Design a protein with these regions (language model features):
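Functionally engaged cysteine thiol sites
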Residues: 8, 80, 138
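Single conserved hydrophobic/aromatic residue that forms the stacking wall/gate
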Residues: 1-9
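Iron-sulfur (Fe-S) cluster-binding modules
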Residues: 142-145
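Active-site cores of enzymes that catalyze phosphoryl transfer or operate on phosphate-rich substrates
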Residues: 10-51
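Hydrophobic alpha/beta core scaffold segments
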Residues: 34-132
Length: 145
């Protein structure tokens, strides 16, 4: 309908304005386009995978890693078996593609204790710190002998 077309046009103007503001501010990373996310998953997961968040979850993790954010907490809601399969199932593939990635799935369900969740996050942060220190050592200028 005419009203729907007008709303789509207005929405696209708003999206472009937000993307421009984010680009100019240098404080935020502008999210990739839908088309770019579709290209990222080629050969990793099928576009037909529409369970849970489907291929988009994997694509967003790949986007984060390629944008310089290799430390990812993948929160899994209780009772969402498709998201659980796609989220956890793709982590090994992503770690093979991006060896320096640090992805940890955290299950949020009544059976998981808060302490267990916090410990898994702390472990992920410890690995992130260790990786950062290792990268600093590798990039440090070598002392002359």
């Amino acid at each position: 309908s005419r009203r729907q077309r007008q709303m789509c046009i207005r929405d696209s103007h708003v999206i472009r304005a937000v993307e421009h503001a984010n680009t100019v501010s240098n404080r935020f990373t502008v999210p990739s386009s839908y088309a770019h996310l579709k290209k990222l998953i080629t050969g990793v997961i099928g576009y037909g995978c529409k369970m849970g968040e489907g291929w988009l979850l994997t694509a967003e993790m790949m986007e984060l890693i390629e944008s310089g954010y290799p430390n990812i907490i993948c929160a899994q809601p209780f009772g969402c078996l498709p998201n659980h399969i796609v989220g956890k199932g793709m982590i090994r593939s992503l770690k093979n593609l991006y060896p320096k990635s640090n992805i940890v799935p955290i299950d949020y369900d009544p059976g998981a204790t808060k302490v267990n969740q916090e410990n898994r996050i702390k472990l992920m942060l410890a690995v992130a710190k260790e990786n950062m220190e290792q990268a600093e050592k590798e990039n440090a200028p070598k002392a002359e002998e």
